[in-house]
């Protein structure tokens, strides 16, 4: 009877410790989420302004004409930040990611403590999960940065009264099939829609845009491409689309 009571007390202590650990994990993941959201918002705001003014400068330099431009309105910046372009605001995605991570961490801790798993094995499993959490965080930030950069550039086209833009995909073998299809397609600025005809079209999207002022303006422009074998970059004509590049530099060379 005494041994059974001692075992019961030990089991009860283990459960109490487990619940405390699970609560600590949840609280810390949410604290991390708050930090990520606050830092990301500042980063995104700075990137919006930088993309807007840099693109205005590039447009004027390309045209060879300097003219006064308006400051980017605060309400436009807020609109870009608040836009649920992918169906869910980035802050909600951060909270979702940390919810998933917290649950996975709790499962590792629960199964480890209840089964008597070694601390080294548990530490390894926890490390793998936090590495994945870091990857998910980086993927979200990279994708959102692509969105706000391209959204800010659209605003710069409006400021310059440019009514069309051209979709620019990356010329290498990592480019997604959807971005390959959109490469060098021309769209109306007023109908730009992130995830549809404006990058990003998917997570880790590397596509961008440039002002479209007619085909003749592309004659003197070069595009960068990456050699599939060496990884080195080289220049191709600005009017060359992804399909043409693939046929000439991948299929024919292969």
Q: What are the roles of these predicted feature ranges?
A:
Residues 122, 126:
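Short alpha-helical "recognition helix" segments of helix-turn-helix
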Residues 26, 30-37, 49, 110-114, ...:
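Hydrophobic/aromatic-lined pockets within catalytic cores
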Residues 1-117, 121, 216-254:
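N-terminal leader/targeting and assembly helices and adjacent pre-domain segments
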Residues 128-228:
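Acidic, glycine-rich two-metal-ion catalytic cores of nucleic acid-processing enzymes
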